[in-house]
C-alpha cells in the first residue's frame, strides 16, 4: 500500500510514524515533508505544494491513500479534486473545511445547530464593527475569520486595543485576506481543552483530550504561536465535562454535518473552553492539531491506519479506539526569535540519542532539514520532544530531561509545559 501524507510539520511526522507501523504500508510519500524521511523507513519526500501538482503525482504513482495535514489545501478543495479523480483521500471536502476556513461560517453553523459557544457578531464593515465595540464588555475577543496559522485571535483588554486590532486586521491587513471579515465575541475566562476526533459523517469518535500551550512565554503570556507544547490527556477533561461536551457540542455538530450533507471522512478538532463549569466551543479545526497530534498519537494503542480506513468505509460505528493508560508531554523546541524573526540553517546536535521507535521517548521533526546526514533548523518551531510515562508529572520531567540532550543555536522552549495544570477530581 502506498500512502501520501500532505504537509511539512511535526504533525505530519507523527502521522507518518504511526501509519508506518501498519505492515500493509510499503511506501510513504511526503509532500513536501521535512527531514523525517531520514528516520522513517521507506519514506520519500516529494517537493510538491499545490493541490494540482499533488493530484497529478497521486494519479501517476497510483497512491492508495492520501492524508492531508495542512489546513490551507483542505480549504482550497484538494479533497474534492481527488474524489473527482476516484482517488481515496482522508479529510474534509471544501464545504466542510469551511468550518475551519471561515470563523464566521463556523459560528453561524454553531448557532444554527445549537452548539454551545460564546456570543458573537461577524463584520465585513469596519465602521460597524467599531460601533459594535460600544456594546461589549472587556476584555473582548477579536478573530480574523480566515486562516491565519493559528495566530489570528486577539484578546483586547479595552476599547482602544479592540479598535486598534480592527484597524490592524481590516485596514492594515496584518493577516491579509483572512482579516477581511472579523468575528467579535465575548471573552470566556477558563481552561482550554483540545479534543481531536474522527468522523465518517455518521458518527464522531473523540480521541483522548489534550492541552495546548499557545503563548510564546511562560504562564501563557506574550505573542500567539502555533503551539509551544501539549499534555495529554488533559487533567481538566473530567467525566462531567466529557458528558457536557458530547451533549452540547459533539452531538449538535454531528446533527449539523448530517443536515448540511457534509459527507466526508476526516478529523474534527474541537477547541473547547471550560468556563464556570460549562463547556463552550471556541473553534473547529478540520485536521489534526499541531502539536496536539504529536502527544495524542503515541498514546493510541489501536492501529491508526485501520481507524482511518474504518472512517473511509463508513464503519466507525463498529470500532473502538483503544488508548494507553499513560500520559504524554510534548515540548516544542523553537528557534530564538520565533514567532517573529528567527534564523534558519543552524546545526542540531543530540538527535542521534533518540529512536523514533522508542515507545517512551520520541523526537518529531518540524522545521528541520537534512544535508549530508546532518540535521539543521529550517523553521520557527523546530522539534517536538515527546515523553510517554505512567503519569503526567513523570512525562513532564522526562520530556524536559530529553530537551537538555538536544542543542542548536539560540534554541528556546517554554519551561512550564503542563506545570500550570494539576489533576482535579470530578
Describe each model-derived feature in a short phrase.
Residues 1-95:
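ATP-binding N-terminal substructure of ATP-dependent carboxylate-amine bond-forming enzymes
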Residues 246-268, 285-358, 370-371:
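Active-site "cap" helix and flanking loop/linker of ATP-utilizing ligase/carboxylase catalytic domains
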Residues 44-50, 121-125, 156:
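Short acidic-hydrophobic, aromatic-tinged amphipathic segments that line or gate anion-handling sites
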Residues 368-372, 376-426:
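Generic C-terminus detector
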Residues 92-151:
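A conserved helix-loop-beta module that forms one wall/lid of the active-site cleft
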Residues 153-293:
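Internal nucleotide-binding/catalytic subdomain
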Residues 21, 38-39, 90, 112-114, ...:
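Solvent-exposed alpha-helices and their adjacent loops that cap or buttress functional pockets
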Amino acid at each position: 500500500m502506498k500512502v501520501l501524507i500532505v504537509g511539512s510539520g511535526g504533525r505530519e511526522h507523527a502521522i507518518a510514524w504511526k501509519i508506518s507501523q501498519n505492515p500493509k504500508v510499503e511506501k510513504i510519500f511526503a509532500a513536501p515533508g521535512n527531514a523525517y524521511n531520514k528516520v522513517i523507513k521507506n519514506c520519500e519526500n516529494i517537493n510538491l505544494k499545490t493541490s494540482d501538482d499533488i493530484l497529478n503525482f497521486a494519479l501517476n504513482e497510483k497512491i492508495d491513500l492520501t492524508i492531508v495535514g495542512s489546513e490551507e489545501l483542505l480549504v482550497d478543495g484538494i479533497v474534492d479534486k481527488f474524489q473527482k479523480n476516484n482517488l481515496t483521500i482522508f479529510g474534509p471536502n471544501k464545504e466542510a473545511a469551511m468550518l475551519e476556513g471561515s470563523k464566521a461560517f463556523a459560528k453561524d453553523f454553531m448557532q444554527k445547530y445549537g452548539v454551545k459557544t460564546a456570543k458573537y457578531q461577524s463584520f465585513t464593515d469596519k465602521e460597524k464593527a467599531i460601533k459594535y465595540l460600544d456594546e461589549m464588555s472587556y476584555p473582548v475577543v477579536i478573530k480574523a475569520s480566515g486562516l491565519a496559522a493559528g495566530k489570528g485571535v486577539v484578546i483586547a483588554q479595552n476599547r482602544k486595543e479592540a479598535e486598534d486590532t480592527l484597524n490592524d486586521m481590516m485596514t492594515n491587513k496584518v493577516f491579509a485576506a483572512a482579516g477581511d471579515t472579523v468575528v467579535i465575541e465575548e471573552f470566556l475566562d477558563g481552561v482550554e481543552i483540545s479534543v481531536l476526533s474522527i468522523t465518517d459523517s455518521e458518527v464522531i469518535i473523540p480521541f483522548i483530550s489534550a492541552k495546548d500551550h499557545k503563548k510564546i512565554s511562560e504562564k501563557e503570556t506574550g505573542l500567539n504561536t502555533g503551539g509551544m507544547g501539549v499534555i495529554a490527556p488533559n487533567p481538566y477533561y473530567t467525566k462531567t465535562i466529557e458528558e457536557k461536551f458530547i451533549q452540547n457540542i459533539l452531538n449538535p455538530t454531528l446533527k449539523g454535518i448530517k443536515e448540511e450533507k457534509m459527507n466526508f471522512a476526516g478529523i474534527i478538532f474541537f477547541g473547547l473552553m471550560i468556563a464556570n463549569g460549562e463547556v463552550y466551543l471556541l473553534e473547529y479545526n478540520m485536521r489534526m492539531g499541531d502539536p496536539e497530534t504529536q502527544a495524542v498519537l503515541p498514546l493510541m494503542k489501536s492501529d491508526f491506519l485501520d481507524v482511518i480506513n474504518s472512517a473511509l468505509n463508513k464503519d466507525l460505528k463498529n470500532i473502538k479506539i483503544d488508548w494507553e493508560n499513560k500520559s504524554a508531554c510534548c515540548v516544542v523546541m523553537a528557534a530564538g526569535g520565533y514567532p517573529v524573526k528567527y534564523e534558519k540553517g543552524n546545526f542540531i546536535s543530540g538527535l542521534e540519542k533518540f529512536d523514533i521507535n522508542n515507545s517512551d521517548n520520541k523526537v518529531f521533526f518540524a522545521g528541520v532539514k537534512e544535508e549530508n546526514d546532518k540535521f539543521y533548523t529550517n523553521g520557527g518551531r523546530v522539534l517536538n520532544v515527546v515523553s510517554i510515562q505512567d503519569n503526567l508529572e513523570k512525562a513532564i520531567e522526562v520530556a524536559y530531561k530529553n530537551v537538555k540532550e538536544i542543542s542548536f543555536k539560540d534554541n528556546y522552549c517554554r519551561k512550564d509545559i503542563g506545570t500550570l495544570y494539576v489533576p482535579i477530581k470530578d
